[in-house]
């Protein structure tokens, strides 16, 4: 299997849209996507290049793209350029990072709020619409029209965004996707049909992004090329889970899932106010206990390009069966891809670093 290698790196003025470079010579290039985050890009440039034309990668004012096989595979904003020995180190993050530099100066996202029982996807779109409605603030980002049943705000606790709030728009957007049974998002970039313009997209998923993959796998001795750390952490371990659901005070629903297994009793509490039935709350508590009782997890692996999981075959949010066997121990199980970084110039050939979380940690739409 031949790994796709970047054919070129392009940069563009963020305000005027003028192309600054259609073949920027970036070395040590690394780039990738992230679940519910912007993902990142890093690399180095020759100092003489930037000294002769600083606008090629002007921090905070430049879009940067990676093209492979004639298709854009990553895009974002250059945020940092600094000297590093005899080179310039460049760092960028994808589209949602822009909201970390914007605030709700008008309140209620320019009059689009407040919100009661509002679809979180709708509020997320309102945040982007507001941010891009201000002069010099339009990235051209399109947010999916996905809808969900995950809501925010109640008559007793209306969701507001005040003009004096010091939390940036990025923090408000993150809050909408940070809980259990909330929508997912990731940033994507592509050419339009005739390759005359860039499509910048916030891809929304409900009840989730990604799917369980039976056609690819990550395995030691097959495509995992380094011995990953198998973490045995007691901080997350619990054989007793207390789940709180809808309601307030003494009327708040509560279910406990507990077993005795010869180990020191450890408890964990979770809050799931979106669950208003004891049966669903009990199922949620049992699912939570299920993954917390498993000692051992793999948070990151490095793979090479093989038929077992060709580069580009997985999507952010996918569940992939993972097998790790080394002298320290073994781990097998379904893991969710929460991010990946492609290193096309890695020593020995292209590599991808995959960030993982146990699939059993996640609950989608209130159902595990």
Task: Tell where the protein language model's regions lie, with residue ranges.
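Beta-strand-rich assembly/attachment modules of structural machines
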Residues: 1-120
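Acidic, small/polar-enriched beta strand-loop surface segments
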Residues: 3-8, 113, 197-346, 360-368
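A broad structural signal for short, well-ordered beta-strand segments within beta-sheet-rich domains
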Residues: 22-28, 78, 155-160, 222-227, ...
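Oligomerization/assembly interface segments of phage tail-like spikes and tubes
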Residues: 31-51, 86-98, 243, 293-308, ...
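A general structural signal for short secondary-structure junctions and capping/turn motifs
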Residues: 33, 81-82, 189-193, 231-235, ...
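A broad, structure-centric signal for solvent-exposed, well-ordered loop/edge residues
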Residues: 36-38, 52, 85-88, 99, ...
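Short beta-strand and beta-hairpin "edge-sheet" elements
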Residues: 65-93, 322-352
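Charged- and aromatic-enriched interaction segments used to assemble
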Residues: 93-232
